[in-house]
């Protein structure tokens, strides 16, 4: 009797990239041309849940997103969030998906800072009170890498502007969002 392989590639890859040495090697090779900027011993597990409640004019909207693998590096008080998205099929809206997931990471951190500022009554000005964010507050960088392991060559967009019908006269007015693709 032979055993069937029922392993799911996405789960195998998530487990592989959770190893700090593999994770650091990947980012160093792909984003830093082999220079060791990330060190395995500096990487810490981070929350993969980006779910959020958005409030606009009294209307609530919930968004649920989970990242595949997320690590955090901390250098004193400063840190960076590093994310991996494994992708087996070409996703023609991947730049938009990355932008949304990165924005949700920033929103999550903003909400944590805003709550702390409100709890501590930390606003020094009306502007800080309004935004619940002090002039000196800063968010931390979020860097995401899409690891595409499909059989076909990636033929999708790698930036938001590649997804847009954009007249030349608007080119400089529309911000772009580029994704890191391997």
Specify the residue positions occupied by each region the protein language model found:
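Accessory alpha/beta interaction modules
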Residues: 1-182
């Amino acid at each position: 009797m032979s055993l069937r392989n029922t392993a799911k590639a996405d789960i195998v890859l998530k487990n592989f990239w959770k190893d700090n040495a593999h994770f650091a090697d990947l980012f160093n090779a792909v984003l830093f041309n082999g220079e060791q900027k990330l060190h395995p011993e500096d990487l810490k597990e981070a929350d993969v849940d980006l779910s959020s409640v958005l409030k606009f004019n009294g209307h609530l909207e919930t968004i649920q997103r989970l990242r595949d693998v997320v690590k955090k590096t901390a250098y004193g008080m400063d840190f960076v969030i590093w994310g991996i998205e494994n992708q087996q099929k070409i996703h023609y809206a991947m730049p938009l998906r990355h932008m949304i997931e990165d924005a949700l990471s920033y929103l999550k951190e903003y909400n944590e800072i805003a709550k702390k500022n409100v709890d501590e009554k930390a606003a020094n000005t009306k502007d800080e009170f309004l935004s619940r964010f002090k002039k000196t507050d800063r968010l931390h960088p979020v860097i995401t890498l899409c690891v595409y392991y499909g059989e076909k060559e990636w033929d999708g967009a790698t930036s938001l502007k590649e997804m847009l019908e954009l007249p030349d006269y608007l080119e400089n007015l529309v911000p772009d969002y580029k994704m890191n693709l391997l």
